[in-house]
């Protein structure tokens, strides 16, 4: 990713309910009555009363070491069927927050009614995914200030690309060798003897 802004895509998964057809709010908004103000600028991303599963995914970014976003969870009565999952999806998935199967009121009360920064260490190339499921008009979340961080170092853990990590490779710069079985500091180079005549 170059520049300072990442794009995003939104997806909806129907669970057999009325979905977003009953006047629900989803998307970029400047509506701030619930949140007071946004943490970065005058707009944020809102998901409310989805009556299904709503997902917002950022565009893919490279060489990421950590990620953060600001999350506002509306203070209301939540059920265990409502959930918020925040993940970084790359070669592997790093879950930063998962309320699935919990009651947000009881198990995540500090998230309600205030902006909370959700962050974590991640690695490599991937995208941030926020998944939200709720079934009441008072159940809303707001997202803002999504940030990807990188120290700028792209570590090459296998310098000779022979499939053995440098920490396990006695010959990290020789792709044809990886062992030094006698410990003399020289790789196990096959020796061929020829007779001199």
What are these regions (language model features)?
Residues 1-42:
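Extracellular glycan-recognition surfaces and repeat-rich motifs
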Residues 63, 73-81, 136-138:
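Extended, low-complexity, turn-rich repeat/linker tracts enriched in Gly/Pro/Ser/Thr and Asp/Glu
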Residues 133-150:
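Extracellular carbohydrate recognition
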Residues 152-196:
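Extracellular calcium-associated, cysteine-rich motifs in secreted modular proteins
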Residues 83-88:
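Short, surface-exposed beta-strand/strand-loop-strand elements in extracellular ectodomains
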Residues 93-124:
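Extracellular carbohydrate recognition and processing domains
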Residues 67-75, 126-134:
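Extracellular beta-strand-rich recognition modules
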Residues 45-62:
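Short beta-strands within extracellular/lumenal beta-sheet-rich domains
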């Amino acid at each position: 990713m170059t520049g300072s802004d990442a794009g995003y895509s939104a997806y909806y998964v129907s669970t057999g309910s009325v979905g977003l057809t009953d006047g629900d709010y989803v998307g970029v908004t400047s509506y701030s009555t619930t949140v007071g103000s946004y943490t970065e600028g005058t707009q944020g991303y809102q998901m409310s009363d989805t009556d299904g599963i709503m997902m917002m995914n950022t565009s893919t970014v490279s060489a990421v070491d950590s990620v953060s976003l600001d999350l506002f969870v509306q203070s209301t009565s939540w059920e265990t069927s409502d959930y918020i999952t925040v993940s970084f999806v790359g070669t592997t998935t790093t879950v930063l927050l998962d309320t699935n199967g919990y009651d947000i009121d009881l198990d995540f009360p500090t998230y309600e009614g205030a902006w909370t920064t959700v962050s974590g260490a991640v690695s490599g190339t991937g995208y941030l995914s926020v998944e939200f499921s709720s079934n009441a008009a008072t159940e809303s979340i707001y997202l803002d200030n999504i940030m990807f961080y990188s120290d700028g170092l792209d570590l090459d853990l296998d310098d000779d690309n022979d499939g053995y990590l440098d920490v396990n490779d006695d010959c990290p710069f020789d792709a044809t060798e990886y062992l030094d079985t006698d410990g003399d500091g020289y790789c196990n180079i096959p020796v061929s003897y020829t007779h001199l005549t």
